[in-house]
Amino acid sequence: MEKRELIYEGKAKKLFSTDDENLLISEFKDDLTAFNGEKKSSEVGKGALNNKISTELFKLLEKSGIQTHFVKMLDDNHLLHKKTKVILIEVIVRNIATGSLSKNLGIKDGTVLPFTLVEFDYKNDALGDPKLNDQHALILGLVEYQDELDKLRRMARQINDILKPYFAQKGLNLVDFKLEFGKDSSGNIILIDEISPDNCRFWDIESGEKMDKDRFRQGLGGLRVAYEQVLSRILAK
């Protein structure tokens, strides 16, 4: 598979065209950003760890019946995947209150929610990724039909129902996570982007230790070791 022109560069990945018009290559970067790009750094090896973690989790979800853009991991930092039309909605799934949920609503940090919360954010850096309700999404034309929003919620809950017990078996609480979706060439809504400690919060069940990008956000240090631990637990059968 030939890697061709750079199409887009985001905070964590570069996107390249290939010699197949239906396939793209994502290059996972070592860059770190937080607070909508206000805090920046890098961590050698972070991109490769996220690529490997995402690969394993995409495989798990595919086996469980979730359609994703995943094709295969090409090397440490490169992932081959289907080309999609990105839906500009970030789907946030929350099992335990922390971060903005605790800050904005006054829910005590670490509170286990009585049911899984699914929220929508507008994927728009210039606006700071504001919260969306269904009417906002439809007015903005981010989707065409209410049924598509319903499907995003349904898929997000299905993914949570797979990943939450999976990580519990690995000694990790899946606190919350962000998902992105796109439409494939047939118009099917599928999971895209990545699933990694960059966009998931993992807390060790026994110690409560944070094993995700909060180590960078909160200046805790030890980010690479935490990501390596997450990958090690995933690979342990």
Curated annotation (Swiss-Prot):
Query: Cystine bridges: which residues?
Result: none
Sorted alphabetically, which CDD domains does this protein's record hold? SAICAR_synt_PurC (cd01415)
Q: Name one GO biological process term.
A: cobalamin biosynthetic process
| Single annotated GO MF | phosphoribosylaminoimidazolesuccinocarboxamide synthase activity
Q: In which pathway does it act?
A: Purine metabolism; IMP biosynthesis via de novo pathway; 5-amino-1-(5-phospho-D-ribosyl)imidazole-4-carboxamide from 5-amino-1-(5-phospho-D-ribosyl)imidazole-4-carboxylate: step 1/2
Please give the Pfam families that the UniProt record associates with this protein: SAICAR_synt
Q: What is its EC number?
A: 6.3.2.6
Query: Which UniProt keywords are present, listed alphabetically?
Result: ATP-binding, Ligase, Nucleotide-binding, Purine biosynthesis
* Catalytic reaction list: 5-amino-1-(5-phospho-D-ribosyl)imidazole-4-carboxylate + L-aspartate + ATP = (2S)-2-[5-amino-1-(5-phospho-beta-D-ribosyl)imidazole-4-carboxamido]succinate + ADP + phosphate + 2 H(+)
Q: Report whether ATP-binding shows up as a keyword of the record.
A: yes
Instruction: Look up keyword Ligase and say if it applies.
Output: yes
Give the family, as the similarity comment puts it.
Belongs to the SAICAR synthetase family.
Q: What is this protein called?
A: Phosphoribosylaminoimidazole-succinocarboxamide synthase
* Annotated organism of origin: Sulfurimonas denitrificans (strain ATCC 33889 / DSM 1251)
The record's gene field reads purC
